[in-house]
Amino acid sequence: MKAVFYLSVHESGRFYGQTLHQDAKVRIKIPIFERFMEKMYKYTVAGHTFGVSLPEGFTQEEYLKPYMPFISETDDEPLFRLTFKTADSLRELDPGKVLECLNDEAPYFWMFEKEEGKYNFGFSYSKNRPDCILVPSDDYKDNTIYVPTPYAERLAEFALSNAMMLLYTFNTTPLDTLMVHASVVAHEGGAYMFLGRSGTGKSTHSSLWLKHIAGTYLLNDDNPVIRVEGDAVNIYGTPWSGKTPCYKNEVLPLKASVRLSQAPHNLIKRLPALQSYASLMPACSCMRWDRKSTDALHKTVEKVISRVGCWHLECLPDADAANVCHDAVAVL
């Protein structure tokens, strides 16, 4: 049986290799993903550089705007790499057994077990099914995010951002680095971090500082990154700022961590070590099923609370709350 091999182009712009068995007149279509079709962009967030490879027709200007302030010109090997690809069907990827679908609201996080101790992940706007699938390498260094071909343009930014947050967290947690769910303001050369459950009013409290505490500006409104660097604890702006477009490539010393809770009054108190740990720990992102990551997280949190004051603010959403907080934490 004779066979020839040739290339064709799908309407999506994807190249396919096709084998045509001339005798049987059977054509087999096989997707080909060539590296030369991709362009890798590199970004540095909190001193950690990573790479993102996009196929022809997808640009960082269109799909990675929040990352533009973090463009890296370094020749260093990236800590990890993420490649964006399309698939005719996510089911064909066979990501594995569904273990759980997490989060109370979108984006929903899916976890699949492909074999014991090895996982694939998904992200979605609803709990019906994953909209994209992340297939990591065993060491999480060379990873691929797949989206359905018909929805590639619509899902690209969503898929890339969620995948990069997960991979960044996994790869940097052992490096004295914490990604934290918090809102952070900058004031007089230092940063003040506000923690709390979703809906507590972290962003609201930050906005009160912006309005009532002169010289204050927003550093990040959802996912800043803390690094312990020598004796210093610094906090960085990131491309991940939730619904607020605040993508500042800046670093400041972390002066205080304040956990908020709603109350009919404004009262602040400093926390002892054990309560400081309990205040910060739930706000940190971590692959908690991975023992190495969890151990590293605990050690970094301990370093942070030993060097940064932690507080609890019972508060109203008013100007007095900002003043009470500022007067307690910003005078140190």
PLM features: residue spans?
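Hydrophobic positions on the alpha1 helix immediately C-terminal to the Walker A/P-loop
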Residues: 205
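N-terminal amphipathic/basic-hydrophobic helices that include classical n-h-c signal peptides
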Residues: 1-36
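A noncatalytic interaction/capping subdomain that flanks phosphate/NTP-handling catalytic cores
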Residues: 33-193, 198, 208-217, 225-332
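Conserved glycine(s) of the Walker
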Residues: 201
